[in-house]
Amino acid sequence: MDPTGIFDLPNTSLIFWEVVTFLILLALLYRYVYPIIRDQIQKRQAQIEQAIEEAEKTRAEARELLEEYRRQIEAARGEARQILDEARRQAKAQRERAREEAREEGDRIIQRAREEISRERDAALREVRREVADMVIMASSRVIGRELDAAEHERLINEALESLEAEVAGGRTA
């Protein structure tokens, strides 16, 4: 007999049957339970892998959409800049046209005013000449005491007008 009691026959048979029972239990578990657990684990692993693949696919699609939206936003900004530039250019052209039209209208008004002034001046000069001629004729008739012929009359009128024009021209330059 073994003093430790490990190799005693009654203990050895108990250990033997415990090992046999354990092996039978393992065989039964391996045969009936393990395949079910393994299948469930594989199914779960496949579901997780599929979920990861779908998440990555969704993430990739989201990135593509984000890039597409960014491109669209940038294109819209570029288009908006073009529209603003075109509007500014058109506004500037419109202002230039309005300035040019105003300048032309001002020039026309000034030209009409100058023409009107010239007509009025010419009319005033004709009136003054006529009145001066009448006064010269009356004055010369009184001084001379007789009627003048047409040539003498014309000469006196021209002298008076030249004298008057010289005075007017002298007054303008002063």
UniProtKB/Swiss-Prot annotation:
Functional note: F(1)F(0) ATP synthase produces ATP from ADP in the presence of a proton or sodium gradient. F-type ATPases consist of two structural domains, F(1) containing the extramembraneous catalytic core and F(0) containing the membrane proton channel, linked together by a central stalk and a peripheral stalk. During catalysis, ATP synthesis in the catalytic domain of F(1) is coupled via a rotary mechanism of the central stalk subunits to proton translocation.
Keywords: ATP synthesis, Cell membrane, CF(0), Hydrogen ion transport, Ion transport, Membrane, Transmembrane, Transmembrane helix, Transport
Taxonomic path: Bacteria, Bacillati, Actinomycetota, Rubrobacteria, Rubrobacterales
Primary gene name: atpF
Protein name, entry field: ATP synthase subunit b
InterPro entries per UniProt: ATP_synth_B-like_membr_sf, ATP_synth_b/b'su_bac/chlpt, ATP_synth_F0_bsu_bac, ATP_synthase_B_chain
Iron-sulfur keyword on record: no
Residue ranges crossing the lipid bilayer per the database entry: 9-29
Classification via SUPFAM superfamilies: F1F0 ATP synthase subunit B, membrane domain
UniProt-annotated location(s): Cell membrane
One Pfam family cited in the UniProt record for this chain: ATP-synt_B
Record note on quaternary structure: F-type ATPases have 2 components, F(1) - the catalytic core - and F(0) - the membrane proton channel. F(1) has five subunits: alpha(3), beta(3), gamma(1), delta(1), epsilon(1). F(0) has three main subunits: a(1), b(2) and c(10-14). The alpha and beta chains form an alternating ring which encloses part of the gamma chain. F(1) is attached to F(0) by a central stalk formed by the gamma and epsilon chains, while a peripheral stalk is formed by the delta and b chains.
